Structures are given as structure tokens and as C-alpha cells.
């Protein structure tokens, strides 16, 4: 059996797809090949995502490949997948999640707490920028886009003191040795779905059940809880929003942030994990009452 899996052209996207292919090979005797697609989001790098249509730009061209039957499935970073799926598509599986934290990288190995006053920090994320300003109001936030390697190179090129990147991506491309500091998930609440990969298929695909074996239940319901929080707040790349759900002894804890009326609101909620979607919605409602 031959499967074609669509993904973006970046090194990270290809590595993430190879992770899924390896998992498939362990579960089933399946031959897989990658279909590399340059998405609109990959082509336009000089403009921030919220000005050109959001993170869905990394997904739409790949969905077209599935519609045209050039691909059987797609692998995405779940943080790039809009909460509203197009008709006829679904996320069939979310494998075990990687480290959800954000990392600080400084080429001179200067710790975040030791940064000079007015230090220039590169990030294109509204969520990261807002939380950086809460931690250090004096910081100068510089927008940067591009793949992981490009952003790291921009530290020198743009004379930055450091940048913020997701730990998961750095680990997957074997660059986590560059990390200077790890942010705790309470001081820097991650993006919705950060660290998780999602396998997208068309609902009518005859072999879609093969992917279900790759699902990691706790990882999936944590991401779904975060996405319920985002959906209730109608969050997207125009929003300053983040959430992280974790499970211990069947109890789910979610921390979320959202910018409302020019104020960053942070709330937490705890409940049984079988109520994951209701917990995400309830957390959003708490924030809206603030």
C-alpha cells in the first residue's frame, strides 16, 4: 500500500512528516512518500501573518492537494491549524505531544534575566510579544519571520539580543543545544496546540482509519480543550491568545491568556479530563467575565 503525505517544504515540516511516516511504518506495512508544497504563508515572509490572512495560509494549499487527490493525508503543526476545519476535512489523529514550552536563544549565551535594559528580542508572535512585555516592559520587540534556521541567523543579521522559538521545533531539527533559557508555561503560556502534530485527512478517505492507531488520547484531548478555548473566544492570529492543557491522574488543568480591552487576562481551570471540551469553554467564559 502506498500513501502520499503532503507537507510544507521547510526542514522542520519535513522532519515532522518523517516522524509520522516512521510511526506508520511501525504500526502498518505502508510505503509512504512526501508531497512537498510551498504554501502562501511560506512565500510571503516580509509581512506579518495577521496582515495576510493568518496561520491558515500554511494549511490551505495542502488541503487543495488532498481535494485534488494528489495526497492522502497531511501533517501539520497543530498550532497552525485554524479551529474551524473546512467542510469534508478532519484531524484524524494527534500523536504524543512534544515539549510545549517556548525557548529563549541568545548567541552570546546571556540568560533572559540578565538581558540589558531595552534589549532587542525577535518574535513575530503577538502572544509571545505580549507576555515578554509583561515580564520585561523595557524590551524592544522586533518582528521576524522565516523558518527556524532563518530566525536564528537573524540574531546576528538584525543585531538582536535574542529570539523566542518553540522548544518542540528546535528539538525536532536538533538545534535545542542552542537554547539559553526555557520559559515556564505559567510565565509564557504556549500557543494553542504548540508541540503537537496533527494528521489531516478527508472525511471520506477509505483508508483514514489506519491513522487512528497513531492517536495519543491524552495529547489529543489536551489539544482539543485548548482549541475549544480558542473557538469560544474566536481566537486567531489577530488575537493575543494562548492556552496549555495538561493531565495528571485523570485531572485536567488548563491555563489560558487572552487580550481583552487592551489588557492581558490570565486564568486557570481544573476538572476531570472527560470534560475536556467543557473545561476549555468554561475557561474562555471566565476570561470574558473579567
Swiss-Prot record:
Residues carrying S-(dipyrrolylmethanemethyl)cysteine: 237
Pathway where it operates: Porphyrin-containing compound metabolism; protoporphyrin-IX biosynthesis; coproporphyrinogen-III from 5-aminolevulinate: step 2/4
Superkingdom, natural source: Bacteria
EC class of the enzyme, as a word: transferase
Keyword annotations: Porphyrin biosynthesis, Transferase
Cofactor note: Binds 1 dipyrromethane group covalently.
Coiled-coil ranges (or none): none
Entry-linked PANTHER family: PORPHOBILINOGEN DEAMINASE (PTHR11557:SF0)
Designated name of the protein: Porphobilinogen deaminase
Organism: Clostridium botulinum (strain Okra / Type B1)
Gene name of the record: hemC
